[in-house]
Amino acid sequence: MILTVTLNPAIDVSYPLNELKCDTVNRVVDVTKTPGGKGLNVSRVLNDFGETVKATGCIGGESGDFIINHLPDSILSRFYKISGDTRTCIAILHEGNQTEILEKGPLLSVDEIDGFTHHFKYLLNDVDVVTLSGSLPAGMPDDYYQKLIKIANLNGKKTVLDCSGNALEAVLKGDSKPTVIKPNLEELSQLLGKEMTKDFEALKEVLQDELFEGIEWIIVSLGADGVFAKHKDTFYNVDIPKIKIVSAVGSGDSTVAGIASGLANDEDDRALLTKANVLGMLNAQEKTTGHVNMANYDKLYQSIKIKEV
């Protein structure tokens, strides 16, 4: 079983408009509301793929109830209730553009943070892999993911971390390391303080930096150009075919789902990397975020090319 953690989930609201007019009324006819957050996207893709998954995180208020009520029944909801209201994130789609208005989310108390920590320990009993995705809610310290990873490691669970900024830096500088991290080139550049490109030799050099010591898998997203990955002392380039992209939103989360599934099933390097990339591409072919059409899985699977570099 795979446990997905979304500490700062949201209701994602989409407002499609022909034209966005400022300082006046804009009326929306076709409103879409879905449970949002990177970890929930991971949950839905794992569910589509047929994995057993349970989802946790911190939710509160009517917005939190909405998230529980609108997840597929086959996803085991194990959320921790807090006093604050779960945030709403609005995307206004207009004239080929997307304008986003993102709430910060609730402020968690010390007692609520401690409560979730105990809740997390309890949820580990029957899982093999834990995914940790997205931003931390207000009130949580930057090193909170480090704390969860330490607990998971002590319980013999594999962890996949997909975050950025201070939260990622705190983990890399900490004593407990995740099994997998999945930065993109921009996030890698931010970590290292220098611009990184798709130069494989340069990537090989930086991924051996002591900053990443102790992390079994480092999977660097290259967008439409695939992936550059390091597993222990072996490096891989994953070449993916060109596809028609409907929406790339959530494709990174779908890739995380594939990584988690590969770890849970003890797959070899090539199988894990292939599955992860196929699920990312399948999501990009869909309008709905965090959804994959498995009818196209086998064809894309055969088109992935992996070589050691």
From Swiss-Prot:
Sorted alphabetically, the Gene Ontology BP terms of this entry are:
D-tagatose 6-phosphate catabolic process; lactose catabolic process via tagatose-6-phosphate
The reaction(s) annotated as catalysed by this protein in its Swiss-Prot or TrEMBL entry are: D-tagatofuranose 6-phosphate + ATP = D-tagatofuranose 1,6-bisphosphate + ADP + H(+)
Q: In which pathway does it act?
A: Carbohydrate metabolism; D-tagatose 6-phosphate degradation; D-glyceraldehyde 3-phosphate and glycerone phosphate from D-tagatose 6-phosphate: step 1/2
* Residues in the signal sequence: none
EC assignment: 2.7.1.144
The alphabetized UniProt keywords are: ATP-binding, Kinase, Lactose metabolism, Nucleotide-binding, Transferase
Any one Gene Ontology cellular component term annotated for this protein: cytosol
MF terms per GO, please?
Answer: ATP binding; phosphofructokinase activity; tagatose-6-phosphate kinase activity
Could you tell me which Pfam families the record lists for this protein?
PfkB (PF00294)
Its family remark reads: Belongs to the carbohydrate kinase PfkB family. LacC subfamily.
NCBIfam families from the entry? Answer: 1-PFK, lacC, PRK13508.1
Name this polypeptide is given: Tagatose-6-phosphate kinase
